[in-house]
């Protein structure tokens, strides 16, 4: 890979031959003109000034014409060179995204989101930085070749001396290439690890906040950042070692040429004009030589980035697309023939499964969490290929079928209802983008989502936000069901399609499903007894093995495991009584229950960043000392660089014109000493800048991440999560890059400008006025450039965040995109965002290409003016030839820093936009404050006082005037239709959000007065969105209490019924879990979440649909454990299944954000209202007479 990455990149560049030819052609023509200009200068000095026998006007016209041509050619070179860089970056990004869309299940399990983000952002930026200079490479090489040819024509001895250092420079460059490539690759790997930590913390932010683990996640980031810090310091040291050395060697060659050329001019071997022309050529070549040396460093970093990007592009699915189309039969059969499968070799998840579903038949597959149901569904849709055996659809092996024809026949309702950014209508029509509004409404009506949609101001055009998390779990699930029904599949695969809806809605959905599956084959993977009414036959899975298949009655009679799964488990009651007497978390003197209370490591806390109106500026003030030292060294380095022109003037006027060779030798020796001193100072400056930059980056990233962790959940809605990831990664790096390089360039440029102006005034003040005539034009051009580019950079930065958000979204929802054959539409969406970012980049490049060459044009015009007037003064004896030559050299140096300042403005704009975003983030108010009340043990009284709440993305309020008082120790179950506000109440108690109006009080205190971390340390929460962080199963359970012993972890798992599932996993409690739990089923994740909440022994327990993914037997165990826990603490439960409501102290019924009923179970049944209807539906759905279940007319 590494040997051919340059060839691969050149292939991408060659896709844009027109731009390449224009850029190279302009570079070639511009180089020829630049190399010939010193010859014009030689003629002017020898013939028009020194000899005084030729007019200056014709030469001035030639110089002005050359300046105009150079401006146009430089514009073309810069514009098309930058355009190539943006086009190739876009092509690489699109190819990487296309590779992502092709991934099968194994590739999706292999790649982390952190790797994806870094390789498509940071690594691509490294490649783009090199591609910007593609035309410059040719220009520099041509400049060197033509320059050497011109110098050889001027003087062979001097030319030989000038090229003596080329082999030395080549050897040093070769060594730097080898070391920098390895160091940069290592640093990029660590950067991917940091991004992975950030992305995981943002994706799992609800879990982080639920258990008050913000500091723990910050510790993770700090540890990953420390490893990155060490790797980046190695890169900085190598850059400091090789960069100044490669730039110093050409300068030493200049001093050697100065000494030899001056001696030859003094001896009459060459003319003063030839000497000045040779020096001008050498000066012209010094810049390309230094640039090429610097580009070697950039090239090694770009190579490391290119290798990583190309690895992503080259990733291929492990399964091979078939060649045969699926048969066009109206009904399809599904058959598993002795199927075995394992995610890891030699660790089977399914063992010898033989199961057939006849065409037109509905089969229900039941089993406990981790039994293999979801894996079976993945094999049917061919996310994976079987290890042994075969899966056949319509009698054809799925491995022989084209994926397009296979997936076009299948409709999938997954256990996790993944939605995409866009509107409700677009998500329903995800599998049929050509669907009419009437067809979308019909599917929504079938999924019982239409009533909710009609209450929204924008109806089906309402945006759902990233991953649809602004909707309730039931609403997302019904949209996913409508999406599958609109697809009109011949084979319908549903994985618990009604687990998050209430009983009344489930009855209606079942009636519709009964009609929908009447003329098609269907497989229902379910844990709910009510769904079995739709099935013709039932299959029972247990630990990856098929136990029984038959009609529901037959299996009920002969399969004990089936009866156990669908019935409560009374034999566990005694264990629960023991558990009640032996709590998992025994109080220990001086020991808290959260990780934050046990760590001795100081990390950035909620108030570590300095307060005030501009926290970013205050934070950067911590590094004033190192930054000042770095800038002081830069100033010394710059001053040393201003001495050579003065030494050259002395050497010409005294050493050459007056034949005082000792003056020439002293000038050359002083120049050499100056170059060496400059090299040492430059090395020190690079070391200090490198160390300081990495320290600032480490500190800034940690503080921004710690602050982001403490923001309210509303900051993570819409695309806020992607913007936060961008802020912690790309934005902090943009700021530090400017501090490390841009600020250095600014200091160099300012010091150079001041020093040159002083020198020019000292040589001849009158000529300075000629230079100042160009300044008003330059100031006007700079103002216009800044005004136009500022808007472009801001838009481009925001668009980059959108590109990253789209990548994260499709990486998370790839299986749904593939199941509904939406890869091409995903590619179109990503292309639109990426192309918009590219066009903004090209627009910015056009502005740069117009502005920077204009500065050089003004420099050339000023040089011509000074040359004309200076020649007249030389003839008049006012100034010497040496003084005029020095003046011309200084003019070249004068406009160089002006151009670099203008170029630095590009980095400044990027940093300014990034700083604005980070400043805005750091200024966002967090729920906690330094004056917050500390929280000890809570009694648990909860009061809602006239509480209203509205989500930012919705006009309809989620809660409207809630007044409730929940005494300490009471168990309250909230019921109602999906979207009625139940989960929002739980989130307000957890203080994920603050009420829009009204107050939530606990133990008589407004939650806004509590220390938010201390308060959440007293809670145990199970949210709808299950998330676990990468690590072992044991780590996942102990997330809220990392100090728990293995025995305590196991006891918590036993009490919620998770222990059998865990021991069935490979390595049991040490089983490795991927970020987000992608290698676990929804039921397994829910059991881990319950054990996690149980372990912390909370004062207030909050359960939001905590058992929707569990089978009845496991659910019964969990409910008994919940009631045992609830006996000692306040417990608030959101439930669609009403089994636990019967045993609760109190039931609160919500509809449309208001309380419509409140009372005990028997009271509400007697009232005959909302709860009575819900209970009647629930009773019918959960009747033990499974074969005779009937849904009531809701």
UniProtKB/Swiss-Prot annotation:
GO terms for cellular component: plasma membrane. InterPro entries: AAA+_ATPase, ABC1_TM_dom, ABC1_TM_sf, ABC_transporter-like_ATP-bd, ABC_transporter-like_CS, P-loop_NTPase, Type_1_exporter. Residues 334-568, 942-1177 form the ABC transporter domain. Gene3D superfamilies: ABC transporter type 1, transmembrane domain, P-loop containing nucleotide triphosphate hydrolases. SUPFAM superfamilies: ABC transporter transmembrane region, P-loop containing nucleoside triphosphate hydrolases. ATP binds at residues 367-374, 976-983. Signal peptide: none annotated. Its main location: membrane. It holds the Pfam family ABC_tran. Overexpression increases resistance to chloramphenicol, ampicillin, streptomycin, tetracyclin and vancomycin. This is Multidrug efflux ATP-binding/permease protein BCG_0231. The lineage of its organism: Bacteria, Bacillati, Actinomycetota, Actinomycetes, Mycobacteriales.
